[in-house]
């Protein structure tokens, strides 16, 4: 079998095109890693109603669950947070926003703010500032509920 120069040139011209396979997919970015904060945390929230009032209420403790969901494209530093409180003074569920500083690894400071429908018939406000470790969160809370101010603390452990 004799191969001509012409056939060899045609083969050399089309060989790179055959290897391409008709195009390809665009490069993909690496899948983002999950935040240590994402997921469900459970613990205790203690509330001091009207702490600066003439007759402050007694502190009330109850179980609480916080669930953090990462907001996409925020460098794992912003979260949609659901707080479910079974505290006798503040039995609420609220959806709030949480921001993490200075970075997205523990230990980090987290700030959470939100509003909720109070069982007392008003719109309440809730805020928290805490230190988040890999498996625990310890922080303070503050807010106003119809129009009673409150302060307190929260301690959470990751499930």
Where are these regions (language model features)?
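N-terminal glycine/threonine-rich, aromatic-flanked beta-hairpin/loop signature
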Residues: 52-101
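C-terminal motif of bacterial Sec signal peptides marking the signal peptidase cleavage site
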Residues: 16-19
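Bacterial N-terminal signal peptides that target proteins for export
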Residues: 1-9
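Tryptophan-anchored aromatic micro-motifs
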Residues: 33-64, 81, 137
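Beta-sheet ligand-binding and adhesion/scaffold domains
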Residues: 42-50, 97-159
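N-terminal helix-cap/turn-to-beta initiation motif at the start of protein domains
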Residues: 25-42, 70-72, 158-159
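Hydrophobic membrane-targeting and insertion signals
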Residues: 21-23
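Hydrophobic alpha-helical transmembrane segments of integral membrane proteins
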Residues: 12-13
